[in-house]
């Protein structure tokens, strides 16, 4: 009997295929790095074909390396980088343009102009839970339709399909038979009404986007179709799709209201489970869908930071201050502090709670005594300070946070997590499986395939790897954070756009 689950985690800088057994234990994984393109300042793109090729390669290789066949796989689940936008031809399957990444800021002027119109901003926030920011898919779709010759006319004729990465991969896996997405990914487009759980005609009119572009929206556990026989040699049922941050929340067993997880990958994403309540933040966080099962919605409150692990990659690649990403841990711990240096990594603007798309990165406090170790440490500390920004916002919105569950590639850095616990003043628990997005996807795919009976049964399998407890003097904590706030204040643009009503 087939009992293995294949989870795909398609991320910003890499694609992973991870095998789990029926007890949700990680059996084997394979990953492939993918290319990001930066054709202009603030523009971030991917090659959709490379995303697909890397996904198929990972699936084939992980099966071969684990000495398994596709027939051994009971279910396949997909998690993905959210908001990243792809339009393709329904007849040929060819992408119309590169995938516009979630970090892309090219539509900032359009978003500002739209937000300045009377009543638009309040209506958008009420319907979507989001803000009018280039982060979300709606303005990216609009840009492609307006700037690629013939795109709008083809869309009006029903010849084009839109999808976030999950939808595009599903189309490719099923040989074009299924054009669908899930509720979590739909909720990040800026076109989905999270109150009514449907595409919103008024929002489509606002952005002048033909409804024929859009995929069908399904629950996170659903029958999404089967992989095409020619791809893996056997038809595997696709039983789950979910955005990567929501997948991580499920993988971290954050299924009860009040539970919080934070994922540290390219960016940092903190998600609070708010149960069946939509909480419109008073502190610039996003209302979103955490998951939807059996037509029942669980909502979340999310803070999004654009640059976390990407700051370490910046230290490695253009600056060559480190050779490998994991060098950052030893270098940060080799100095007592940053020597007064603060890095504000606003390379693509600042996300929550500032939402300033025009802010740009800055280093403060440099002296002749500044060493590269100080800058490396400042980059890691910046991730933790930004996390404290989010925690303060969550607390001010009424949550009670005593423990934070963390995952993602950066969570392997012990120094980072200890400093995180210190600066937050709360316990930090690292999951035994730091591939929480893949684990959550496997949980849901297994549920959809009947391998698990309930969400509670699955998440009962969650285990902590290590607990980090605050050790920093509270006065020192406040001094360091005060320095961060002053650095951010100097980085913000004088006339940051009004993104909230």
From Swiss-Prot:
Q: What class of enzyme is it?
A: transferase
Q: Which reaction does it catalyse?
A: glycerol + ATP = sn-glycerol 3-phosphate + ADP + H(+)
Report residues binding ATP. Answer: 12-14, 266, 309, 409
- List keywords of the entry alphabetically: ATP-binding, Glycerol metabolism, Kinase, Nucleotide-binding, Transferase
Binding-site residues for sn-glycerol 3-phosphate, renumbered to this chain:
12, 82-83, 135, 244
Q: Which cysteines are joined by disulfide bonds?
A: none
Any one GO MF annotation of this record = glycerol kinase activity
Binding site residues for glycerol: 82-83, 135, 244-245
Identify the pathway.
Polyol metabolism; glycerol degradation via glycerol kinase pathway; sn-glycerol 3-phosphate from glycerol: step 1/1
Matching entries from Pfam families are given as:
FGGY_C, FGGY_N
Annotated GO biological processes are: glycerol catabolic process; glycerol metabolic process; glycerol-3-phosphate metabolic process
Q: By what name is this protein known?
A: Glycerol kinase
């Amino acid at each position: 009997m087939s009992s293995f689950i294949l989870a795909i985690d398609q991320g910003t800088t890499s694609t992973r295929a991870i095998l789990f057994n029926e007890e949700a234990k990680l059996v084997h994984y394979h990953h492939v790095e993918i290319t990001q393109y930066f054709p202009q300042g603030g523009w971030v793109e991917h090659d959709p074909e490379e995303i697909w090729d890397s996904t198929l390669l990972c699936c084939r290789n992980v099966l071969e390396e684990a000495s398994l066949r596709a027939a051994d796989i009971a279910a396949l689940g997909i998690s993905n980088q959210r908001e990243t936008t792809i339009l393709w031809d329904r007849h040929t399957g060819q992408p119309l343009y590169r995938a516009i990444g979630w970090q892309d800021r090219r539509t900032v002027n359009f978003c500002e102009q739209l937000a300045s119109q009377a009543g638009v901003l309040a209506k958008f926030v009420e319907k979507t839970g989001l803000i009018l920011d280039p982060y979300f898919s709606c303005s990216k779709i609009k840009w492609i339709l307006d700037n690629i010759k013939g795109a709008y006319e083809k869309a009006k004729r029903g010849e084009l399909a839109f999808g976030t990465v999950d939808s595009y991969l599903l189309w490719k896996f099923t040989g074009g038979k299924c054009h669908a997405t899930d509720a979590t990914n739909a909720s990040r487009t800026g076109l989905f009404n999270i109150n009514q759980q449907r595409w919103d005609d008024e929002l489509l009119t606002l952005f002048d986007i033909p409804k024929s572009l859009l995929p069908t929206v399904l629950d996170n556990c659903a029958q999404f179709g089967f992989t095409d026989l020619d791809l893996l040699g056997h038809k595997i049922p696709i039983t789950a799709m979910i955005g990567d941050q929501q997948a991580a929340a499920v993988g971290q067993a954050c299924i009860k209201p009040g539970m919080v997880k934070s994922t540290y990958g390219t960016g940092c994403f903190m998600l609070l489970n708010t149960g069946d309540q939509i909480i419109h933040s008073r502190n610039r966080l996003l209302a979103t869908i955490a998951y939807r099962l059996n037509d029942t919605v669980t909502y979340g409150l999310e803070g999004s930071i654009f640059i976390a692990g990407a700051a370490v990659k910046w230290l490695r690649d253009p600056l060559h201050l480190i050779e490998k990403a994991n060098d950052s841990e030893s270098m940060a711990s080799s100095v007592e502090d940053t020597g007064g240096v603060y890095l504000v990594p606003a390379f693509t603007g600042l996300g929550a709670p500032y939402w300033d798309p025009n802010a740009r990165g800055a280093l403060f406090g440099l002296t002749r005594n500044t060493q590269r170790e100080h800058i490396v440490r400042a980059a890691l500390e910046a991730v933790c300070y930004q996390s404290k920004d989010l925690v303060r916002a969550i607390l001010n919105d009424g949550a009670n946070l005593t423990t934070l569950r963390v995952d993602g590639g950066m969570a392997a850095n012990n120094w980072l997590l200890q400093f995180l616990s210190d600066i937050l003043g709360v316990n930090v628990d690292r999951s035994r499986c730091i591939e929480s997005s893949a684990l959550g996807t496997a949980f849901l795919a297994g549920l959809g395939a009947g391998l698990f009976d309930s969400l509670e049964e699955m998440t009962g399998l969650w285990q902590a790897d290590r607990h980090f407890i605050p050790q920093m003097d509270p006065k020192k904590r406040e001094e360091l954070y005060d320095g961060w706030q002053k650095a951010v204040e100097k980085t913000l643009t004088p006339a940051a756009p009004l993104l909230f009503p």
